[in-house]
Amino acid sequence: MAKAKAKPKQPVFLVVVDDSEEMHQALQFACGRARSVGGRVALMYCIVPAEFEYWAGVGELMREEAREEAEAKMAIHADYVKKLTNGTPILYVREGDIRDELLELIDKEHDISLLVLGADTQSETAGPLIAFLMAHGASRCRVPITVVPGNLTDEQLDALL
């Protein structure tokens, strides 16, 4: 008797959620790719730990506020992903250095198949995370990285997909 073929895994497109203007282009591109190939979008938000804590209670309060802010931002972007893909995104909230947390997440979550980042087109560099990945992190990243220029419109991105 022949073995049943294993169902191919759904590609997962990871977008780092931050306050940059170009994050929108990365999210738009990832949603378009997910829609066109039957994949999913994953969102990662990294909470930067407080530099110093005066008292344990103050530090805990700061951590709770940062978590609430992260969850609020993720909810907004998750709704956008649902609207564009008709699918629920995978959500990751991490705490620590964004570079380490990103690479650790990609290494741990084997369903992630592509990292999508938006590039700052208004300054000399594409952004600190892209600069890090191109200089040091690419050798540690097990998935391809797509860099989307931050000056593209939604219509231009949709035309590419």
PLM features: residue spans?
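Short, solvent-exposed amphipathic alpha-helices that sit
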Residues: 29, 65-77, 101
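Gly/Ser-rich helix-loop-strand patches that form or flank binding pockets
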Residues: 1-3, 106-161
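A short helix-to-beta-strand connector/capping loop
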Residues: 84-90
